UniProtKB/Swiss-Prot annotation:
<dbReference type="InterPro" id="IPR000891">
    <property type="entry name" value="PYR_CT"/>
</dbReference>
<dbReference type="Pfam" id="PF08502">
    <property type="entry name" value="LeuA_dimer"/>
</dbReference>
<feature type="binding site">
    <location>
        <position position="210"/>
    </location>
    <ligand>
        <name>Mn(2+)</name>
    </ligand>
</feature>
<feature type="binding site">
    <location>
        <position position="17"/>
    </location>
    <ligand>
        <name>Mn(2+)</name>
    </ligand>
</feature>
<dbReference type="InterPro" id="IPR013709">
    <property type="entry name" value="2-isopropylmalate_synth_dimer"/>
</dbReference>
<keyword id="KW-0464">Manganese</keyword>
<dbReference type="InterPro" id="IPR002034">
    <property type="entry name" value="AIPM/Hcit_synth_CS"/>
</dbReference>
<feature type="binding site">
    <location>
        <position position="208"/>
    </location>
    <ligand>
        <name>Mn(2+)</name>
    </ligand>
</feature>
<keyword id="KW-0963">Cytoplasm</keyword>
<dbReference type="Pfam" id="PF22617">
    <property type="entry name" value="HCS_D2"/>
</dbReference>
<keyword id="KW-0479">Metal-binding</keyword>
<keyword id="KW-0432">Leucine biosynthesis</keyword>
<comment type="similarity">
    <text>Belongs to the alpha-IPM synthase/homocitrate synthase family. LeuA type 1 subfamily.</text>
</comment>
<comment type="function">
    <text>Catalyzes the condensation of the acetyl group of acetyl-CoA with 3-methyl-2-oxobutanoate (2-ketoisovalerate) to form 3-carboxy-3-hydroxy-4-methylpentanoate (2-isopropylmalate).</text>
</comment>
<dbReference type="InterPro" id="IPR005671">
    <property type="entry name" value="LeuA_bact_synth"/>
</dbReference>
<comment type="pathway">
    <text>Amino-acid biosynthesis; L-leucine biosynthesis; L-leucine from 3-methyl-2-oxobutanoate: step 1/4.</text>
</comment>
<feature type="domain" description="Pyruvate carboxyltransferase">
    <location>
        <begin position="8"/>
        <end position="269"/>
    </location>
</feature>
Amino acid sequence: MNSPVDRILIFDTTLRDGEQSPGATLTVEEKLSIARALARLGVDIIEAGFPFASPGDFEAVQKIAQTVGTENGPVICGLARATQKDIKAAAEALKPAAKHRIHTFLATSDIHLEHKLKKTRAEVLAIVPEMVAYAKSLVNDIEFSPEDAGRSDPEFLYQVLEAAISAGATTINIPDTVGYTTPAEYGALIKGIADNVPNIDQAIISVHGHNDLGLAVANFLEAVKNGARQLECTINGIGERAGNAALEELVMALHVRRSYFNPFLGRPADSTAPLTNIDTKHIYATSRLVSELTGMMVQPNKAIVGANAFAHESGIHQDGVLKNKLTYEIMDAESIGLTNNQIVLGKLSGRNAFGTRLKELGFDLSDTELNNAFIRFKEVADKRKEITDWDLEAIVNDEIRQPPELFRLERVQVSCGEPSVPTATLTIRTPAGPEETAVAIGTGPVDAVYKAINQIVQLPNELLEYSVTSVTEGIDALGKVSVRLRHNGVIYTGYAANTDIIVASARAYLGALNRLYAALEKSREHPPVVASL
């Protein structure tokens, strides 16, 4: 097999499949931030998007190729359906990258052929090699995926894969598109491909799976035992429906259980060489970044990166951990970059100390962004005695990583209490330029603020979720507000942090509305194209 026998390749699709999560829409700048973090993490391939889907997707893939796709950086990949228009757009967007890959796909299951593609098996067998060969004429590194491989007839699947490899595919990816298979079934599927596709030695076997039954990670680990050498995954497991296989869970499973998996890669069981290229100390920071930018909070009991992953409530467990961590912990929290050794800054801290700490925390800011974040830091430091790493993260995300402020909050004031009626007065600068002021009453101060905003913005929506969390302890702590709203079936998120919860609430809601407004403007110009796998 033409595989990296010494390790497993990590193919991250957070920016493509992960962004298909409801409400996870990202701006170009946010995608760049995540791409930089993924490169720092050490992923081998970044699937940057679906260039043909929209001008915004094309621009994002192109910019990631320009800035992250360096000679020493990851391979930058673009998704394309098995059509010349899609493939040509992907090749064009990927041109700036030193190492680039086109990932093209076509369904092979009978249910997809009959109900979605309206094509016969013979037609699919003709299209696949033709489109792979066309992609190969533009880019040397080609990945082909038979969509819904998990429910495809194995004998037909073998024929399609053989044809794709003969036409130039260098990676063959096997998607469990609907998360239907069990580990034993998926492992057998991979073994069947390894044993029955005559030219499989000319390609790397990759796996891609969804988590509808909660089995994606288990399926992938079984696939590794049967010959898979590339794992397609996302940070925090985000993705359509129940999500994708979680990168952090796969990497740490291979890291912690290295001696178990080593023999399947032809290594001695006691080999200490890493099984992946991932720098695990960047896992936690990358997880936090993706969570903040997508608005998708990580559940507390989530493996590896959840808030409770290294917490112990039971007295027996606490006693054991204090005596020896290994009594109840199979990995060190510091191995994923989670540490309590925080540096505390204050209002006398200078710009250099501030910038240095941000770099240590994994932030890569331009001079302008750093200046803006430092101004905001000083404002918060005047209200708080100490600024922790969590505060810094919230400040940067709130100040720098926001959608364009098409509607900008200028002033907000509320009055409330017993027995008065909660009333909000606010002023917003609109995209057209002038300021508009509105006054509204509500059941509470936040409700009044949101009603006043709606008077000005006038974008019909349904508020699905409003949550407030404290960034750190203390009555003067920063409060972080997250908002999710729905418009015409599409979910948009907003977040903001401030020591004043009313201000944070207003900015978070406006952030979601700004995303909605921008999306509506784009869709009027270019209706989006939806991918799958």
